[in-house]
Structures are given as C-alpha cells and as structure tokens.
C-alpha cells in the first residue's frame, strides 16, 4: 500500500487539528454543568452520554493525518480510564492544553526535546504535590459517598447507592452493575459468588444424579497461570489431604498431564478435589481472580433502572464511572475537586528551574496547562474562566469554586472531591502523549486510492441474445 508523508510544522499542524476536533467534543462534558453528547448509532436509539472516554472512542476523522492526531488523544482518555477508572475528560483537556502551549514554542524555534524534559520535571513535581495533598478515605463511607456523587455527575442518589453497597460488602467487596427490570435503581446482595465456568473433568462430580460437584468449607487455591507440573503444588496439596477438607483449584488452565494426576488422586485416595478454569480473559481474568480472592460478604449487585433504553445506557455509564472512581479514592485517597488540586500544585513549580531556557519553558507550559481543567469547568458553567482561576489562585488550601452552586467555598466541606489517583494519572498520561506529539517530526499515513467507477455496459450487451 502506498504511503503519504508529511514533515515538520505541516505535520504537527494537521495532527493538532485532529487533537482539537476530538478534545473539543470531549471537554463539553467536564464538570457539574457539563453538557451531554449525542452519538448516532447505526442500529437502535442514539447513545446520550457525559462520559469523556465514550465520546472519544466514537470519533474517527476522514482526513488520515488529522485522524492520527485524534487517535493520540483517544489513547490518553482510554489509558486514563483503564488505569484510574475516571478522569478521562480531564486528561483530554490537559493533553490539548500542553500540546497547544508546547506547539507555539516549538514553532517559534524552541528545542522539542528540551521542552519535553522540562514538562517531565514539572509533572514529577505536581505529582508529588498531589500525593501530599491527598487525604486517606479509610472506612469513612461519607467520603466514599462524596467521591461517587461527584463522579456520577453530581447525582446524590447514585453516590448514596454506591456507599450503601460498600457498607454491605465492605469497601474491598465485589460490586457488579446490571440492568433492572423496572425504573427504580436498587441494591441486591447475593451471598457467595457465581461465574460461568464448570469442572474440567466429570470425575470430579460428587452428586452423580445432578452431575454436580458439591463441597463444604473447601480450601480454595487461586492461580493466575497454567498448571502443567503438579510437583510444585505438592506442598499445597498435602496439607489439604491431611486436614480432610476439600480443595477447589481455580487456575488459568490445567494441562492434560496435571489433570490426569488430579483425577487419579481423586479416584484412588478419595481426595476431595475439583479443578475449574478461571473465568474471563486477559486483564479481565486477573480482575475476576482478585474479586474471588477478596470475596468476603458476598456480592453487591447495583440494579440500574430507567424509563428508556437511552436513559439506561447513560445512567449505567455514570454508575460505572462512580464505582471505579470510588475504588481509586480508596487506593490513594482524595484531594479537593473542581481543578483546585492542580491550582495548589502550581506553588510547587515556583522554585523549579530547567538546565536551559527551553526546559524552563517546558515547566511554564505545565504551569499554564494545569489551570485548564478549572477554566473548562467554569466555561461549561457559563462563567469567565480567567476571573475564577485568579480568585482561586489567591486562596489557600481547599478554597475553590463550586460550579454547581456558583459559590466560592471549602471544597472538602462542600463534598467536591476527586480521587488523588485520578488527578495524578490524568496528568501523567496527558503529559506523556503531549511530549510524544511535540517531539514528532514526521507523520506517515496510508494513501487513499481513488477507486475507479464501474464501467457502463455497452448498448446491446444486456443479455445473451446477441451472441452468435
């Protein structure tokens, strides 16, 4: 396939058009007064969402160069969603801001590599500041409720549901999301756990009438790799045999030799054992094995109800965002929300200098870029960003602007908090992709081939009758 190549300013300009197209569509969703985006679907009703990564994933541009730029920022949103569960829109806004500021300086003749080094130094300082600002959540379910509420687009009902679910199965418990039959959103707690896998051999069956393997108070061995040699497992198998308790083995797979050995032991020594293949695939499998490992008080199921299918999808997106953000908050703590944590981190950059002028420029780019989430939240609320940023910058600690109520107040006290992990990961991913963008000198894309139109048939060639 033939390729097209663009270099230097021309290449970066085309990439930036793609970045802006995607980022402008995503950033309208940021903050409590962020707007919805309607996505056309080829089949079924349109999808209405306020989830940044959902919007990003739907965007494909016709121009190959611009589409390459859009895909770079899409990667920022996706990776942030995967790593932290939320903050996809914030990461997109930050990436766009760093790219825009950086591109001005690179075009003016600054060294892209030195600017990238300055950006990396500044990001490391901001991350340290976020870690120092973070406040641990612990078992404080009120704080958990605050995080869930903010992440669910300031829906207190969803926030309370997630906090209640965590109270019932502990903050490390398993919580799943399903569609309700009616319009109400409720919580159900299922004792134990269910996954879609069965025994690997019929010889493990204990109830031949029902063809089921039933065990009481078994030891459970969870292994995230393939079992191919049972010698390594003998130290685990022997205590199980001596205790007389059954043993359930959940592994990625068990090869035929190891499975035969288990079956022979089951038949000869009456060892109560059963081997099961782990549920899920790839990263999802690892998550599910972790869920099984921490299973304590059963599984909480959030049944999401809505009046229509369109509303159901949108609400389910928000519940999923809120749940994942809550997990992130439990992991690394919470910071003041509404972009305030970034504003407070600017102070940590005041004394930071680069090894040369271009590195110092890179530090200044981050100083300016981390104001952008607050500016965008304010813009989406219909106010003037520069004025609010100035006033919040003059404040101390958790003082910030609550866009939902249009009031300047203590963000922690008002319940406007973000998970520290989300705040950190959003900046790290945005800076990583922006740095790659600024140091790009050449873009190669596939050349579109003009497909010739089908030739028209000559007169008199409509059928076979004219043939001799």
Spans of features found by a protein language model:
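Glycine-rich oxoanion-binding loops at beta->alpha junctions
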Residues: 45-81, 200-211, 218, 222-235
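N-terminal, positively charged regions that mediate nucleic acid binding
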Residues: 1-43, 461-468
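Amphipathic alpha-helical transducer elements in NTP-driven molecular machines
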Residues: 8, 12, 16-23, 66, ...
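Extended, low-charge hydrophobic alpha-helical regions
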Residues: 7, 60, 66-67, 299-468
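Long, structured protein-protein interaction/assembly regions in large complexes
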Residues: 127-332, 336, 448-455, 460-463
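Short, ordered loop/turn segments at secondary-structure junctions
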Residues: 41-44, 53, 60, 95-99, ...
């Amino acid at each position: 396939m033939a390729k097209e190549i663009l270099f230097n300013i021309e290449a970066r300009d085309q990439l930036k058009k793609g970045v802006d197209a995607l980022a402008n569509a995503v950033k309208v969703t940021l903050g409590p007064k962020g707007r919805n985006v309607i996505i056309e679907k080829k089949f079924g009703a349109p999808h209405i969402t306020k989830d940044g990564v959902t919007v990003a994933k739907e965007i494909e541009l016709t121009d190959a160069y611009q589409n390459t730029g859009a895909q770079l920022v899409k990667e920022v949103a996706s990776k942030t969603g995967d790593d932290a569960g939320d903050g996809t829109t914030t990461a997109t806004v930050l990436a766009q801001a760093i790219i825009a500021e950086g591109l001005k300086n690179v075009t003016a003749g600054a060294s892209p590599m030195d600017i990238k080094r300055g950006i990396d130094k500044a990001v490391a300082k901001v991350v340290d500041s976020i870690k120092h600002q973070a406040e641990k959540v612990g078992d404080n379910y009120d704080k958990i409720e605050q995080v869930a509420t903010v992440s669910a687009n300031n829906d207190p009902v969803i926030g309370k549901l997630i906090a209640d679910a965590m109270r019932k199965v502990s903050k490390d418990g398993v919580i799943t999301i399903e569609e309700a039959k009616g319009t109400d959103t409720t919580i159900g707690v299922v004792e134990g756990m269910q996954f879609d896998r069965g025994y690997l051999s019929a010889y493990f069956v204990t109830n031949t009438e029902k063809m089921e393997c039933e065990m009481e108070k078994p030891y459970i061995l969870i292994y995230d790799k393939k079992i191919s040699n049972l010698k390594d497992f003998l130290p685990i198998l022997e205590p199980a045999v001596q205790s007389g308790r059954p043993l359930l083995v959940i592994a990625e797979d068990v090869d035929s030799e190891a499975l035969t050995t288990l079956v022979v032991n089951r038949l000869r020594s009456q060892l109560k054992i059963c081997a099961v293949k782990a549920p899920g695939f790839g990263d999802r499998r690892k998550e599910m094995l972790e869920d099984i490992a921490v299973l304590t008080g059963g599984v909480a199921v959030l049944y999401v109800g809505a009046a229509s299918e369109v509303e159901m999808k949108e609400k389910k997106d928000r519940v999923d965002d809120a749940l994942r953000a809550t997990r992130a908050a439990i992991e690394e703590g919470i910071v003041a929300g509404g972009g305030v944590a970034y504003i407070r981190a600017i102070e940590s950059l005041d004394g930071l200098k680069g090894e040369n002028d271009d590195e110092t420029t890179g530090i200044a780019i981050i100083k300016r870029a981390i104001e952008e989430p607050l500016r965008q939240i304010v813009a989406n609320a219909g106010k003037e960003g520069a004025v609010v940023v100035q006033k919040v910058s003059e404040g101390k600690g958790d003082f910030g602007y609550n866009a939902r109520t249009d009031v300047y107040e203590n963000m922690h006290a008002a319940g406007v908090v973000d998970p520290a992990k989300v705040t950190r990961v959003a900046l790290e991913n945005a800076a990583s992709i922006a740095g790659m963008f600024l140091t790009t000198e050449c873009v190669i894309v596939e050349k579109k081939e003009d497909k010739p139109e089908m030739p028209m048939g000559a007169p008199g060639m409509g059928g076979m009758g004219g043939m001799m």
